[in-house]
Amino acid sequence: MADIDQYILDDSDIAFEYELQKSPSVEVWQRYIAHWEAQVCEDGVRSARHILWLYERMVTQFPTLTVWEQYIGWFRRQYKLDQYLDTFKLYERCINSVKGPLGVFAVEVMLFCISTFDLDIIMKGLQLVLHRCNKDEVERIWNIVLGFALEHVLPSEEGPNNIDFSAFNDRNYEDLRLDIYKLLFLGGDQTEIEDDEEDEDVDKWTASLLRYYLQVANEDKYDETLRLLIRTKDIKIIKECFDLYIFNDKTGKNNRESKKEYDFDLYIYYLDTLDKLRLDKDYKSVFDNLLEKYPQHRVLLTLKLADFHMKRADFDKMEKVLTKALSETVKTNEFIAIYTYHVNFEQAYVETIFDEMRDDPEIQVQKKWKSEMDDHLIILGDLTSRYHLLVNDLKIRQNPNSVSNWLERTTLFEDFDKKCEVFVEAIKTIDPIKVKDKEYGMLGKLWCDYAKVYWSNKSYEEARTIYESATKVPFPDLQDLEIVWHTWAVNEFQIHNIERALKILRKALTVPPSYESIIDRFKSENRRLPSQTILFTSKRLWNYYIDLLESIPTIDANDVIRAYDTLMTLKLITPVGILNYATFLKQNNNLHGSLQVYEKGINMFPPEICYELWTLLLDEVMEPAHQATKERIRELFEQCLQQLGNTDININSIYVKYSDFEIHNKLFSRAIDLLMSGARRPYTNKEQLKQRVDLWESAISKCEEFLGPDSLRQLLSECIQELPNSKAITYVLKFTKLEMSLSDYTRARELLQYGAQLLPPIKNEELWGLWEQFELEHGDKSYYKEMLLLKQKLEKEMKVDTEEVSKGQGNVQFVASSVKNQEAKTNPDEIEIDI
């Protein structure tokens, strides 16, 4: 009763107690508690201890979740986090006394536990509520706890992701030397050193939490959870969970077959875990399994295995692993990674022993270390000296049909026998059909280089055997076969065996019957036929054959002629070949044949080449030595103009040459008519207009030189009407000066008036200057005034460019000298061109 006396202080308390005895209920308890809480606030008669006493009695009598929530809520408001352990005990008592599911109350419990930041409380709370919740609440609770662990507990660095082999070469070189030093001179297992260094960073609490979570998590959460688990660095729990959830090893029988495929980096971390736990047998089992399942990651696994052997000071096995990997990898970046790793290790190994021998006299006298250093110096030297050969090995593995790689390989050996071995290996390996387009010609060169090895050694018969074999290789492209035959012939010529060289070329260039159908078939088959079928079309061999024939003073000229004729029949001759053939015939006094070569060759080439050949032919035929008739020469000129007249080629020189020929024959009018016929041709662009202007200029110049003023007047009249205004103005001035020189001032004034209307005054200053000077010398005041009035009028009216007007309406009317005020014809081809 002493305890009751501490709390029951007045009649109202007794009344509540009596009511609770008579008809106990939660409502009575709540009114009782509210009554005492009021006393705590009003007069301080009561304390929190009194309220606590009532709540304890209420939850004992009515242990429902609602009552407990009211009690815990009051307690937390009263004490906040100062007494969080007592609060947790209340939660614990509540859960143990309440029956049935907790519902959202379980979430409240976990939120409270999280707010304490007490890892033991959080774990106990989690274990307390999980079995009393439904699926949705369990998921929510785990999200809360895992979120807390991720934000506040788990180390911030990320787990493995996109693991690649670059990490091995990113290792600090001095750290590598330190590791080697510990292995060589301190003894022990490198994994022990790593374990000591990592113990401080292990997050055992999160590891235990995640292990607990994996027991209830769906399989689709395994990957994410295992990655979080890796960040805890608790390798024992990591191995345990990987065994259970990746390898499904619940029997303890070391089953290493994963039921579901996970990202490769997870398996790699598991491999690292086995390494750190020194489970070497398991490590090798998993390694072999991964090597079989992930061949695309062979290099990373190889470096892992090399590192594994290094940590156990098993350097011989490490060397074998790296050497084998260097000879098998087919990717450049992988080769670089393995090579760099190997070289760095060997260098660090040698330097570590060297430094220790230098600093420690006891080690200096031990032969073991000197021998170790020498052995690894040899390995290091071999790696560096054979670098280019190793790289070439890699290239050939990447593409055994790459001829350039084999050619490069032949340069890496100086020894005769080894060089020949490379050529033989290359010839056996390369499939001519699989040689890429960009390497056409290289395979033929490789055969020739092989033969050259013997030829340079004066083993001519062996070299000829190689050349003979090369001519039978089914090269898909003609370049390769050309190189073989050409090089063989050149070599024979260089040792003065000219007859053999000619025999080789004649054999290669034998033209088969129905050669046209053979060529067509080769083209249609798209290189599926061997190039031997069209060897006779090789321009390179034909040109060399002809050069060789022409270089022999005693050769029969008919042999050369037959070669040239065959070349023309096959349509393989070049413009230079035409020139050479014509020159050869001319030197052999066959002038008629020389001209015929030009005439035949002209039709074999595009207009640009035709023009050059026509020029040569016309120059040649006009030489006195040919004694060609004038009619024959004119016939050739006409053929030339007819063939080239409708092309875009500038043939002004042909017109001028033809005109000069007629002048030489005293046919001046015909010479000028020829130039005018070229000038009258229609034009469509600036360049063609310039060409026509040049011909008009040439015609006017020759007319002025060889014909009289009347002819010149007629020519200038037509020129002015044919050309656009901007070009015609020059000839208006020329015409004006002609009339002035003949004292026909009226006609000169009419020409000036006409020319003034062709262009705006601002663009026609030369004409206006000439007109003003003309009126001052030959006119009077009225004519001068008319000139000024016309100029003012034109300055106002000619706002639009007269060039534009002339396009649609022709030039300004031109008054011919023979008939006054005659309307000039329009020029429909006139366009505005200002050059």
From Swiss-Prot:
Q: Name one GO cellular component term.
A: Prp19 complex
Q: Kindly give the SUPFAM superfamilies that the UniProt entry links to this protein.
A: TPR-like (SSF48452)
What is the name listed in the Swiss-Prot or TrEMBL entry for this protein? Answer: Pre-mRNA-splicing factor SYF1
Q: Which GO terms describe its biological process?
A: generation of catalytic spliceosome for first transesterification step
- The secretion signal range is none
Origin organism is Candida glabrata (strain ATCC 2001 / BCRC 20586 / JCM 3761 / NBRC 0622 / NRRL Y-65 / CBS 138)
Q: Which InterPro entries match?
A: HAT, HAT_Syf1_central, HAT_Syf1_CNRKL1_C, Syf1-like, TPR-like_helical_dom_sf
Q: How does it assemble?
A: Associated with the spliceosome.
- Swiss-Prot/TrEMBL HAT repeat ranges: 7-38, 46-77, 313-348, 414-456, 458-494, 517-551, 589-623, 628-664, 707-741, 743-777
Q: What does this protein do?
A: Involved in pre-mRNA splicing and cell cycle progression.
| First-listed, main subcellular location of the protein, grouped into a coarse class | nucleus
Record's family? Belongs to the crooked-neck family.
Cellular compartment(s): Nucleus
This protein's UniProt keywords: mRNA processing, mRNA splicing, Nucleus, Repeat, Spliceosome
